[in-house]
Amino acid sequence: MRAAVVGVTGYSGTELFRILSNHPEIEEINLYAREKEGISKRFLNKEVSAFRNIKNELLPYDAKEIMERNDVVFFAVPAGVTSKLAAPFIQNDFPVIDLSGDFRLKDPKEYEKWYKKPAAPKEELEASCYGLADFYKPDTSYIANPGCYATATILGIAPLLLKHLIKLDSLIVDAKSGVSGSGKKLTENSHYPVINENALLYKINSHQHVPEILQQLKKFDSEIEALQFSTTLIPVTRGIMATIYAKPKDADGFSLETLKKAYAEVYHGKKCVRVLEEGFPQIKDVQYSNYCDIGVAYDELSKTISVVSVIDNLVKGAAGQAVQNMNDYFGLDELCGLPKVPAWP
């Protein structure tokens, strides 16, 4: 197979290149800049110092050439880009895995409200599918890869809704992300003197992944209307920890065993989700892997459920899940080419 990557020089793009380079079914990777014309020759080893031995040229963007030369294309670009570029791929039913947020929300008004950018045409949004790989196989050729916070949060909450265990108005999510989740571009919050030995709460109840999370949770339980969602930047390079709190629907008949059974049943056979029998996961447990690790607890005194969900934001939260979606689309084993052992320590 031949794969194209548009936007390889960002953090998600470089992670994607790393994974695809070790994929046994990928024989050729072609790299494209976002610009169509007027760019001087650019080479990956000059753009990303870690890839100094990689001589691939970044080619000017050309949708026709991408489709003629490749079997699949990955877009690892910021929001607001693929909404303008998707049309020829959708018209030709060409496989796309889009790591941006442009096709995750099905309501154009919701996208424009949360992303502050023009939305893709509604007919194009309807031609795409949401690639939550541990629950769905792609049913269209245009796959919207889930966001990092959304992935950790949805996987952490799913059994609570699918098993109808909680009071829907009690859901609280406290999510924390490493600095790579903010992207490659330097901001004041990601500046070393600011984030080092610090924790920064940002976008409380206004993060663009909130409507994405709710859109998916409604598929698990259509009666859910809202959740309390906060995001904190922490001084680690990669990783997300989502701590989820909720109240059981029937506290009198609820127990920790009820909770454990629900998670074991929902995630039975799902290769990329690991439910701990005891204790809680830590970010280090999943770094450089495509796993989501989950631990649960129940406090009988306060009648409160606690769930901890951790992922690597650049792998399971971006490039790894994108490759998992590609594997599913082409009928490969979903773990094909994905790192099966996390890095430790």
Predicted regions and their residues:
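Predominant activation on well-ordered alpha-helical scaffold segments within soluble catalytic domains
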Residues: F17, I154-A158, V210-L214, A264, ...
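Generic secondary-structure signature for well-ordered alpha-helical cores
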Residues: S21-E25, L162-I166, H207, Q215-S222, ...
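Short, solvent-exposed beta-strand edge segments and adjacent coil->beta transition regions
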Residues: D139-T140, E197-A199, G239-T243, S306
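Oxyanion-binding "anion nests"
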Residues: S206-F229, L233-T237, M241-T243
